[in-house]
Amino acid sequence: MKYWKKLFFRRTKFFLVFVSLFFSFEFVFTSVAHENSESTANDITGGDFTLNSPDGPLSLQDLRGSVVLLFFGYTSCPNVCPISLATISNVLAEMSPAELEKTRTLFISLDPERDNLELLKKYTNYFHPNIVGLTDEISVLKKVAARYGIKYERSLKPESTLGYVISHSSDIIIVDPGGIVRKTFPHDTDTAPLLKELKLLLRVTTL
């Protein structure tokens, strides 16, 4: 009996280690699949754009006077996008009501085939009501993404229930109240430096 107990625990331990390693590898693989080379503010042309939101067309120009956070992704993104939006949500939670009034966050979906406006609204509201989901036709999205240094590519995954994934740059882009790109942060940035940058821009705005 003791022999079988030892054998059972050894096999169980091996199985748990194997499962842990498998999911660790899967997470790393998926993370790599959803990230490309990052951009810096100097690499970004930027500029105004108009995309569709759940409440109608929204232009970046309409947000003059506010600090804007831009993030490109898609709702089926398994890890990079949720991490980024959770970080942004934590930053927004640290702001005063007056600061929130002068801060806008735009989540631009690169997957218009799956991400309709109703789904985008539910997805962004899950993280924070200040986050607005935007999308449009693929041709329009490509132009906006290129101007903001976002590289992305759709890859078929027939073995996956999703059917395809989208590899994409994952910077959080900060646009100042004048519509100029000021800084970019990696998707896994800590809350503190992002919050510090936003507060700095907001203070400059109110001077």
Residue map of PLM features:
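Thiol-based oxidoreductase modules, predominantly thioredoxin-like and allied folds used
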Residues: K102-R114, N130-S139
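N-terminal "domain-start" segment that seeds a small globular fold
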Residues: V32-D62, A86
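Short active-site neighborhood of thiol/selenol oxidoreductases, capturing the structured segment around
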Residues: Q61-S84, I88
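Conserved helix-turn-beta segment immediately C-terminal to the redox Cys motif
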Residues: S66, I83-I108
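Bacterial N-terminal signal peptides
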Residues: F15-E26
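Thiol-/selenol-based redox modules, centered on thioredoxin-like
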Residues: P158-L207
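Short, internal strand/loop/helix patches
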Residues: K121-S169
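Bacterial N-terminal signal peptides that target proteins for export
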Residues: Y3-L16
